[in-house]
Amino acid sequence: MQILQQTTIGANTTGASNTAFGKSSLKANTTAAGNTAFGFKALCDNTTGSLNVAVGFSAMRLNTTGANNIGIGKEALECNTTGYENNMFGNEAGDDITTGFQNTAVGSNALG
C-alpha cells in the first residue's frame, strides 16, 4: 500500500517507548525515549531529546537534544534544538525559539 511507504510507526534505532507516525517523523532518533511525533517531519532531527510531544507538519523538526517539550500545530517549536520544558500550541507558535526553556505560548505565531 502506498500509504505504508510514507508512514513510519514506532521508528527509531535504539530508543525506547517512542511513537512516530508520518514521513520522516523521528527520523534521526538514536537513544531518545518517550517521544511522541505525529506529522510530516515531526521531531525529524531529534537524536537524544526525550519526553517530547510534537504534533503537526514539521512540529519540533530541528530539535536534537531538547527534552520535555510540547509543540502542537504546524511548525510549532520548529527551530528548537536544545531548549527544554517549552509548551507551544498553535501554528508556528514558538517557531523562532532555539535554546529557550520554560516558555509557554498559545496562538498562531505566538512567540514566533
Regions found by a protein language model. Give the residues of each.
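Glycine- and small/polar-enriched repetitive beta-structure motifs of secreted/surface proteins
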Residues: 1-112
